[in-house]
């Protein structure tokens, strides 16, 4: 008996120019997270997702898309913008991890101070955040 595996197509395809991707393109499993850095459920899922990535290795392609829910999380959009600023410097995943590991420090003054202390954003990057977020397909909710 030759069982075939079900194949699924993503409604919104993964695009390297827009998405933040970890893992090989040819991985048998693609997991797309629409995440909000201030969401407590996303924060609780973060270590679980890290463990899944660790266990699956090259069998998983993980894709993160910023999805700040501003109606519930007033600091989520600025946190996502900081992640995009870090992305412009090739350091998205470092900032991504930092934001989830320090969810209690997402207020503007903490966010910019931490980002600059970590060397993730420059003053120029902070000024062009709205443009960068639009170019990366930043999902905004209001």
Q: What is each of the regions a protein language model found here?
A:
Residues 32-33, 37-116, 121:
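Structural alpha/beta surface segment adjacent to cysteine/selenocysteine redox centers
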Residues 1-32, 115-117, 121-127, 134, ...:
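Non-globular targeting/processing and membrane-anchoring segments
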Residues 41, 131-134:
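Residue-level preference for long, well-ordered alpha-helices that form the structural scaffold
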